[in-house]
Amino acid sequence: MSQQNIPFTNNVQTADFSVQHSKSEKVNLMNMTRQEMREFLANLGEKPFRADQLMKWIYHFGEDEFDNMSNINKVLREKLKKVAEIKAPAIAIEQRSSDGTIKWAMQVGNQQIETVYIPEGDRATLCVSSQVGCALECKFCSTAQQGFNRNLTVSEIIGQVWRASKIIGNFGITGVRPITNVVMMGMGEPLLNMNNVIPAMQIMLDDFAYGLSKRRVTLSTAGVVPALDLMREKIDVALAISLHAPNNELRNEIMPINKKYNIKMLMDSVAKYLAVSNANHGKVTIEYVLLDHVNDGTEHAHQLAEVLKNTPCKINLIPWNPFPEAPYGKSSNSRVDRFQKTLMEYGFTVIVRKTRGDDIDAACGQLAGEVIDRTKRTLEKRKFGKSIMVNNH
């Protein structure tokens, strides 16, 4: 199947990045937590338990047609058909890797986001996107090269889980393992879309929806410190920090957000989150992508150990996954091994993440989708004749 590419956009400076709907449109029930659905149904004169029933139909049974909800009376079904709908992003393209990984390009308006299913052993992880593109400009990430368009809505986030669950189905029937974990590590910076990401994660945790343990839902952030400080008051899930550099000078270069929220500010915020979190077992996951002769030297490992000496953590080393026109190279196995061993000598738990789905550009850092960029950054690149790479997957 052929794929068209349209750019994504998410801008931190603009006031509103959400999708605008006309007042005449039906309400999408996937945009609601169970409490919000109860309030919606109360306005229709219905009792709270109807929200519980609807949530089960939508998320336990994958139902999106009111007429098929047999324990909801016909009067309410007819009422709902007039004012509400159940709508998740549609699958535009599916790609299956030789290692069992599946990547879906999902349609959101006239753009596409990417969602990745990663089975391994007795678990299967779904990597979910939070924005159409990304505004953070991390130099080693394919998504960042697409620019930014907008935040995803709650329904567009939880709808990725719903759509994937529908396709994966029951393990005993399809031979494909059901989703056991969800990671907010797809396209976008989740903490720049808190108003939609948090309700979506609440639905993931809700027993009337997916009922995932808070230890099986992970939010990964590049370090939007004020939002992380706020998140600890809103929800408790597993936390992963995209650190990728052991000092501010290098992190400023490869992750410009560090110029605003430096490493100390970020790690102080992490400590506050861990102090109140039950989901993290007292430890945060540190993600560190290895770039050949950029951040993978022995001196970098020693610096990283110093940065993390007071932070209970597990370190995930991520072999960098190439994308077109990227300015970096992949670290050799010997450099990866040396980096890992150096950190382990300090007593850290250090895992080298296995690359999955790289044959379909579904590996970490390779997600691109189709983004209509709205940032001045890519407009400037076009002005000065620099090519903007849009990947066709």
From Swiss-Prot:
GO terms for biological process: rRNA base methylation; tRNA methylation. Binds 1 [4Fe-4S] cluster. The cluster is coordinated with 3 cysteines and an exchangeable S-adenosyl-L-methionine. It is found in: Cytoplasm. One of its GO terms (cellular component) is cytoplasm. It is an enzyme of class 2 (transferase). Keywords: 4Fe-4S, Cytoplasm, Disulfide bond, Iron, Iron-sulfur, Metal-binding, Methyltransferase, rRNA processing, S-adenosyl-L-methionine, Transferase, tRNA processing. Specifically methylates position 2 of adenine 2503 in 23S rRNA and position 2 of adenine 37 in tRNAs. m2A2503 modification seems to play a crucial role in the proofreading step occurring at the peptidyl transferase center and thus would serve to optimize ribosomal fidelity. This is Dual-specificity RNA methyltransferase RlmN. The lineage of its organism: Bacteria, Pseudomonadati, Pseudomonadota, Gammaproteobacteria, Pasteurellales. The gene is rlmN.
